[in-house]
């Protein structure tokens, strides 16, 4: 999902609720699946966040956050789809596509 969207691994921060977006009138939304949406800047194309509203999931693109102090890279998703060309050195929780979809209760994956 993220690799095809951005050409490489995507880094996001799970929001506690729906993302509070300043300048929402500049945001376009692409429905990428039955349950998921990609939100991006309609002016420059920057990836802003990914949402699965029915599951209450909002992943904010890390590059859009001014201060990442105190945040840690803890989880890799879609690990079964990861290409062999890279591997992260730090220990992380690794979720397959099926495990991630079940975690966010995506329709059809209950």
Feature annotation, model-predicted:
Residues 1-110:
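A short Gly-Trp-Pro
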